[in-house]
């Protein structure tokens, strides 16, 4: 279930645990997704998938303190990440693992003759050579808001900004301080029609993270849920999500402990905001609290 929620890929690769992800598979599917998006950039499902895989598996495959990456990315009860690949020659995931973490920005923008698509929200600078215009995007990662500013040049084009599938409440786009719409459809693109862009034009995007449950496509069989000796019935299971992030608790060891008593509005889940405006492995991190359990 967690594997599907984070868009993990693989099934028993290298005769290992059958429910484990391979970093190289995610890497290759992101390349495919980026190319498919070029053929149909108005379909936000491609970049929703891309964002979720990038943020959960790819970024999660890098050791937070020193250079190590994952080959197989274990998820589930009592799982831990098998770090390795200190040199790129160790495995295929060592080579692609080195590449993964220097190209987060490569699918942020897409362009046609007269349209700019903003597909991801992260600190980046775009120089559109054909239009001779430069735009700078500023935000903290993970981004609940972002600002895009024209820093040099003038050009005429339309701008389309992705409304993530999880942005179901409070999403807004402002152009020079004025909202461009009163309603935004999740998993779509908000459109600023063709106009003359000039230096100091500013686009502000607000996208509060929303709590939701990403349910599996079928029920968890009772025989699997009861393997640890706790007798449970066949039931629907899902992953607790905060925006695009699959949240995990580090102290759950069996399916009984993983059972949460929540209502359909998720009102019992409390969001703990980050302590300070930081980007990195220890900053700008969100925590969810429910029934005495902590999810990060």
Q: Language-model features: where?
A:
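Surface-exposed beta-strand/loop patches in extracellular or lumenal glycoproteins
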Residues: 149, 155-165
């Amino acid at each position: 279930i967690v594997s599907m929620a984070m868009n993990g890929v693989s099934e028993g690769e290298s005769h290992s645990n059958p429910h484990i992800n391979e970093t190289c598979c995610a890497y290759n599917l992101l390349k495919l997704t980026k190319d498919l998006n070029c053929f149909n950039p108005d379909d936000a499902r491609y970049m929703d998938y891309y964002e979720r895989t990038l943020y959960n598996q790819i970024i999660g495959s890098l050791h937070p303190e020193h250079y190590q990456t994952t080959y197989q990315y274990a998820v589930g009860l009592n799982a831990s990440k098998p770090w390795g690949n200190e040199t790129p020659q160790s495995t295929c995931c060592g080579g692609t693992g080195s590449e993964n973490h220097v190209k987060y920005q490569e699918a942020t923008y897409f362009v046609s003759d007269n349209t700019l698509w903003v597909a991801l929200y992260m600190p980046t600078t775009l120089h559109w050579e054909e239009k001779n215009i430069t735009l700078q995007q500023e935000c903290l990662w993970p981004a609940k808001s972002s600002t895009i500013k024209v820093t040099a040049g003038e050009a005429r084009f339309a701008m389309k900004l992705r409304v993530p599938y999880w942005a179901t409440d409070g999403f807004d786009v402002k152009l020079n301080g004025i909202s461009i719409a009163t309603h935004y459809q999740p998993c779509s693109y908000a459109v600023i029609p063709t106009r003359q862009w000039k230096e100091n034009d500013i686009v502000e995007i607000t996208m509060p993270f929303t709590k939701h449950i990403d349910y599996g496509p079928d029920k968890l069989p009772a025989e699997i849920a009861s393997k640890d000796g706790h007798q449970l019935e066949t039931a629907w299971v899902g992953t607790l999500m905060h925006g695009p992030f699959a949240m995990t608790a580090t102290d759950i060891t069996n399916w009984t402990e993983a059972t949460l008593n929540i209502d359909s509005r998720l009102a019992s889940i409390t969001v703990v905001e980050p302590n300070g405006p930081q980007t990195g492995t220890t900053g700008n991190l969100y925590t969810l609290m429910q029934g005495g359990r902590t999810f990060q």
